[in-house]
Amino acid sequence: MSLSDPIGDMIARIKNAQVRNHKKVALPSSNFKVKIADILKSEGFIKDYKIETENNKPTLSVDLKYYSGNPVISTFERVSKPGRRIFSSADSLPKINGGLGIAIVSTPKGVMTDIEARKQKVGGEIICKVF
């Protein structure tokens, strides 16, 4: 099956799993999705992730994080979409919820948070925002 927006699919699967209070969610793996999962883990939005291989297909297994029974991720939205790409310079990167959330940005120096992109003074495509 071909997906037109694999990152949007990842976001939807994580949001749906959290609504149902699942502890884990499995999704097709790619290098880009692993980088996003690594950022989510380092920022404390998910517990952990691991790559498993089933029938020669890599699967990304994400352990979701909850606090007092509520999901840690309250908002997880795709910003740049396949039909409408959103780019931003380092100076005009948005602050998510007054700096409490993060934007995940794809830059020439790799995938990073908006905070890291501002420090390195590099802009790029705003993939999604998490709060």
From Swiss-Prot:
Domain of life: Bacteria
Purpose: One of the primary rRNA binding proteins, it binds directly to 16S rRNA central domain where it helps coordinate assembly of the platform of the 30S subunit.
NCBIfam families from the UniProt entry: PRK00136.1
Lineage of producing organism: Bacteria, Pseudomonadati, Pseudomonadota, Alphaproteobacteria, Candidatus Pelagibacterales
Assembly and oligomerization: Part of the 30S ribosomal subunit. Contacts proteins S5 and S12.
Cellular component terms (Gene Ontology): ribonucleoprotein complex; ribosome
Alphabetized PROSITE patterns for the sequence: RIBOSOMAL_S8
PANTHER family in alphabetical order: 40S RIBOSOMAL PROTEIN S15A
Family: Belongs to the universal ribosomal protein uS8 family.
Entry annotated with the keyword 4Fe-4S: no
UniProt entry keywords in alphabetical sequence: Ribonucleoprotein, Ribosomal protein, RNA-binding, rRNA-binding
Gene Ontology biological process terms, A to Z: translation
RNA-binding as UniProt keyword: yes
GO terms for MF: rRNA binding; structural constituent of ribosome
Name by which UniProt lists this protein: Small ribosomal subunit protein uS8
